[in-house]
Amino acid sequence: MKMERLERTAVEAQLTELSGWALNDAGSSISKTFKFANFVEAFGFMTQAALAAEKLNHHPEWFNVYSRVDVTLNTHDAGGLTELDFKLAKAMEKAAARGVV
């Protein structure tokens, strides 16, 4: 299924539902830094997020150092942001809710 790139107004509307996510200057990706109490919590979050990503067949760009996980989402095939990015962001929020400091 081909996902259509969202218009800037739709992206901004979706962002109002997500705390702490930022739109990059080009409007082509969203990002957030998640902070946890320790590496085990960070890795647990990444595991849950990976399962959600696999279910959606949509995978994040992320970077982990100890208790911090930096996430960037976009849809390469669409050249910007799609509904999939926001579905994955919401799934990540649920995964993080149990351990974010």
From Swiss-Prot:
GO MF annotation, one: 4-alpha-hydroxytetrahydrobiopterin dehydratase activity
Q: Which GO terms describe its biological process?
A: tetrahydrobiopterin biosynthetic process
Q: Can you tell me which family this protein belongs to?
A: Belongs to the pterin-4-alpha-carbinolamine dehydratase family.
Q: Which HAMAP family match?
A: Pterin_4_alpha
User: Which Pfam families would you find in this protein's record?
Assistant: Pterin_4a
Q: Which NCBIfam families match?
A: PRK00823.1-2, PRK00823.1-3
Question: Which residues lie in coiled coils?
Answer: none
Protein's UniProt name: Putative pterin-4-alpha-carbinolamine dehydratase
Which EC class heads this enzyme's classification?
A: lyase
Q: What is its EC number?
A: 4.2.1.96
Entry-linked InterPro entries? PCD_sf, Pterin_deHydtase
**Reaction it catalyzes:** (4aS,6R)-4a-hydroxy-L-erythro-5,6,7,8-tetrahydrobiopterin = (6R)-L-erythro-6,7-dihydrobiopterin + H2O
Q: Which UniProt keywords apply?
A: Lyase
Q: What is the organism field in this record?
A: Rhizobium johnstonii (strain DSM 114642 / LMG 32736 / 3841)
